[in-house]
Amino acid sequence: ARIFPHLHSQKDVDVLNTMLEHPPISDESEPGWYAKPYAELHRTSDTDRFVEDPSEGDYPVYGGSNVYQFSHDPSFVGIDPPEFWSVEEDVDPDSSAKRRVREKNYRKLKRALYHAFDGTGSQVSFVNNLLAEHRNEELSEDDVLLDCTEYRIVFRDIARAKNERTIIASVIPDGIVCTNTLHTLRPYEIDPDEEDLTCSPLYPVYERIFTDKSLFVALGLLNSIPFDYLMRTKVDTHIVMYKFEESQVPRLTKGDEWFEFIWQRAARLNCYGDEFEEMRDRLGGIEPAASTDEREEIQAELDAGSFYAYGLNREQTGFILDDFYQVGNPRRMTDEYFELGLEKYDELAQGES
């Protein structure tokens, strides 16, 4: 059953009716991208794969406190350094967090192959026989393509309606795995064809859900004030997966109004540092926003564009900004920021950007 949002006024109803015209973010029937969150590792049951001493690990294991909106390290905002680390699979597979992720996703790959080729009987026997026919090799965990081989969106699990922001999302560099305090959006879907079955490993069966640009349009919309306003009507202490999946987002793709406007600004906010040099090149050499003032202005522009993408008029936009919950000592959500957001909304109405 869908969650009915907590509404307090007729204006709330009018705003939400406009926002609900868009499809749920997890709806795969819509063209382009979609978002499927999941917990990659668990702090309790997978603790044997974590170490606390960075010198004993090869890569960080991120949790919710290691990211903020458009931030994957403390360069611009005070976030914690990683608490845990782990080792590569070829160093010690029995201690590797990446190996544990691979083990967990093996069944998903097997099931996808079984259904894609109209399997009957035992999944194990059918898939192994299918692959033996095509490549003389049964399915193995090494056929799993890890999500951490690609840049991907993550968002904090712990969230409250009375926090400064309810949704806190970032794109993180590749090579990092995450605990359940940081939900991840799958960057790949499994869509095999017969030609793929000759490959070892089976990486060609994986296709990216997001293009480079749509990854950042999705990030921009997730971190926008309109989406936050929607989510805080149904959040208590955590971002429950099904509540996130049913929430509506404009599914902007290349050629849509506001697509270029939003992805460019989200990318400039997020793609800083050496870890994002490759992504900056893939996006055509974008310049990351480096100063606090510049980042605030770009985020206000992004918020303004998101109001338009949702189809919210000026009165509705003003209502959301006036009604948005403010904490006592905000990082960014100040009266001045809300005024700047409305100013940017008006500038866009006049064709200024």
Where does each model-flagged region fall?
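S-adenosyl-L-methionine
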Residues: 1-353
